[in-house]
A protein has these predicted regions:
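A short acidic-Thr-Gly-centered motif at the start of a beta-strand
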Residues: 1-2, 60-64, 365-380, 585-589
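Conserved "right-hand" nucleotidyltransferase catalytic core of DNA-directed polymerases
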Residues: 1-16, 34-36, 130-365, 380, ...
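Conserved catalytic palm subdomain of right-hand nucleotidyl-transferase polymerases, strongest
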Residues: 5-6, 73, 95-97, 373-389
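Short active-site loop/helix that positions an aromatic residue
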Residues: 12, 76-88, 105, 246-251, ...
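Active-site-proximal helix-loop-helix substrate-binding element of RNase H-like nuclease domains
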Residues: 27-37, 41-182, 337, 417-422, ...
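Conserved pre-motif C helix in the palm subdomain of viral-like polymerases
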Residues: 169-175, 565-585
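Active-site palm subdomain of RNA-directed nucleic acid polymerases
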Residues: 181-193, 579-599
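A common structural junction motif
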Residues: 463, 616-626
């Protein structure tokens, strides 16, 4: 036996979508119902564990044998569930995930959607969702079902038979996907990165249970107080209803089209009296400050560690990681100077003092979300992140030497950019210091062919800049960065040429090719970005553009239009991702326990190592990136925060 393809059907009273697989498999009533498998791509067999069948010893040993490949679509689910079933942790070595391989080739992270895109003969069965609802989750007790809370096989033998067919079909579909993808193997280095990712997810991160419970309780108190006050002021049955509140505001003489955050903020600028207070209460009531605390409570296991928070290859156009469950990639920044004081007041339930000291207690709860992640006793977090990594990689790729020199000399890149743009010295809090903000917004908004719209999205108008000033910032920045501008147009030209001629071209340290309907961009690391079904289309201006297929808003598979600057953004972010994975590989090999990573930052739980040592490891450029200057900065803390 060389390869085992697997799919499980399971039961647990925990909600998989809310709790994640680690907590799901911890449930006292967790059970594997069906075990479908194929040995070396042979016939698929289904073991009906729920009806008393057993898994053969040969298969059990194969699951533990790291030299035998175990394949599944979303293999993390199978590995974690089987670890619980066997009573021992199955290490990720030897486990391979067809979902990850699909993502590597620009395909969806869903078995059903991949099957549709690849037009497989054997698609995932549509009956599956209804069968899972029937057999895999608790049912509502009714007189008709004899007040039972769970459906077992004998309650509907016909459905159970279909469930077994569904289980078998999932393995057949997974194997068919594997066969289709075999022409484009994923590099071994990426499977090694996947193993590290699985180890990090298995390790998890500790949640401060007391802080979480206190924050949720305080939010309930705040919401009740704010609702009572809003009812008192408006006389409305439900002042949190946009329809009712808009009508009340209109009667008071305030014409407001929407109660969206920006509209309320705008209206507050000129509001007075009751209207001002009611709008302020509306802001407080609409804040979702405790949703992430609720998510933490749902996800944390018996040991209070939250696991499965990071999705490997979650962003399949770049290969970057994405957040799951608590969505750690999207945490509110903290800017409180007395963060520890606020944290301790909430944790100790000292709500009255908190309300006296802070104008917006709900805002404080939002800022404390990060601090609910804590280091275990006897350790502390070392938090280290790359400094301006995208700006560094972009300049390195384009050969924009003055930017590289600025980074090498330790200069403030926003000051140096402004100086280059306007031809005058710029110093932070010094001579021409007011220009630094323009250098900053230009650096952040213009690097990927961003123009007026990008600067507006970055908040340029809110900063008091006119459209004319914003356009001049774009023009000055492009003039100051000719090599980056050339990079956009060069990439655009090469990609179009390759798609038209179905050829292969080397550009700088990239290789761009078209193979079997897929546009590939090989990065300096040798990893490839994939753009399925790429072809020449027409943009809204009547010019040529590249169109490929991928996941769009609403999780739909559709056509996506792209251009030079957008491809450059994908390439730069993908290279930055590869730098992060190499750094994490080095850290893990040296025995450092990464418990979380967010964007370009790693969080390590350590009892002895120093921040200097971690930063030094992070700052090592990969051998495939000669001349790239990296820098990492960090700090230590007993809880997670932004420094």
């Amino acid at each position: 036996m060389k390869r085992l393809s697997i799919d499980l059907e399971t039961y647990s009273s925990f909600d998989l979508g809310k709790s994640g697989v680690y907590k799901y498999a911890e449930s006292e009533d967790f059970e594997i119902l069906l075990f479908a498998y194929s040995i070396d791509d042979g016939e698929v067999k289904v073991i009906d564990l729920a009806s008393g069948e057993i898994i053969h010893e040969e298969i059990l040993q194969a699951l533990k044998d790291e030299s035998i490949e175990k394949w599944a679509f979303n293999a993390n689910f199978e590995r974690v569930c089987l670890s619980r079933f066997l009573g021992e942790r199955l290490k990720p070595q030897g486990w391979y995930c067809t979902m990850i391989w699909s993502a590597y080739l620009g395909l969806p992270l869903s078995l059903e959607k991949v099957g549709e895109v690849l037009k497989l003969d054997k698609q995932k069965m549509n009956e599956g969702k209804a069968l899972i609802r029937y057999f895999s989750i608790p049912c509502k007790p009714t007189k008709t079902n004899g007040m039972r809370t769970r459906n077992l096989p004998h309650h509907d033998l016909e459905k159970w038979s279909t469930f077994m067919e569904y289980n078998q079909r999932d393995v057949e579909t997974e194997m068919a996907i594997k066969k289709k993808l075999s022409a484009f193997p994923m590099p071994q280095s990426e499977w090694e990165n996947y193993c590290i990712d699985q180890n990090i997810n298995d390790r998890g991160i500790l949640i401060d249970e007391v802080l979480v419970d206190s924050a949720i309780k305080f939010d309930e108190i705040l919401r009740e107080e704010n609702m009572d006050r809003a009812i008192e002021l408006t006389g409305l049955e439900n002042p949190n209803s946009p329809l009712q509140l808009k009508e009340w505001l209109n009667k008071k003489g305030l014409e407001i089209d929407s109660l969206a955050k920006k509209d309320v903020e705008s209206a507050l600028k000129n509001a007075e009296g009751d209207i001002k207070e009611v709008l302020g209460l509306r802001q407080e009531l609409s804040k979702s400050s405790v949703r992430k605390y609720d998510a933490m409570k749902n996800v944390k296991g018996k040991d209070n560690r939250a696991r499965g928070l990071i999705q490997f290859y979650g962003a399949n156009r770049t290969g970057r990681y994405s957040g799951r469950l608590i969505q750690v990639q999207n945490l509110r920044r903290n800017n409180l100077k007395d963060l520890e004081l606020a944290r301790s007041l909430v944790k100790n339930g000292n709500y009255e003092t908190l309300e006296i000291l802070y104008e917006s207690p709900s805002d404080i709860l939002s800022q404390l979300i990060r601090t609910a992640f804590i280091a275990k006793e006897g350790t502390r977090f070392i938090i280290s992140d790359f400094s301006a990594i995208e700006a560094r990689v972009l300049a390195w790729l384009a050969g924009e030497q003055w930017v590289l020199d600025a980074f090498e000399n330790g200069e403030d890149i926003y000051c140096r950019t402004a100086s280059r743009m306007f031809g005058v010295p710029v110093e932070k809090h010094g001579v021409n210091g007011h220009l630094r903000q323009k250098g900053k917004i230009a650096t952040l908004a213009c690097g990927y062919q961003g123009a007026l719209g990008a600067l507006k999205a970055m908040g340029g108008i809110e900063m008091g800049l006119s459209e004319y000033e914003l356009q001049s910032i774009v023009d000055y920045w492009r003039e100051a960065n000719p090599n980056i501008v050339s990079l956009w147009w060069d990439i655009d030209s090469v990609v179009k040429r390759v798609v038209k001629t179905r050829s292969k071209e080397k550009y700088k340290n990239l290789v761009i090719s078209y193979e079997k309907g897929i546009l590939f961009i090989q990065l300096p690391s040798k990893r490839r970005l994939a753009y399925p079904k790429a072809k020449i289309g027409m943009n809204r201006f009547g010019g040529e553009s590249i169109v490929y297929e991928g996941i769009v808003v609403g999780n739909k598979w559709d056509k996506i239009e792209s251009y030079g600057g957008k491809f450059v953004e994908n390439i730069v972010q993908a290279i930055a991702r590869d730098i992060l994975t190499e750094a994490m590989m080095r850290l893990e090999k040296k025995g450092f326990n990464i418990v979380m990573h967010i964007h370009d930052e790693v969080v390590i739980e350590s009892d002895s190592s120093s921040i200097e040592e971690i930063n030094e490891i992070m700052s090592i450029a990969p051998i495939w990136a000669p001349g790239l200057i990296l820098d990492a900065d960090g700090f230590e803390s007993e809880f997670y925060k932004k420094d």
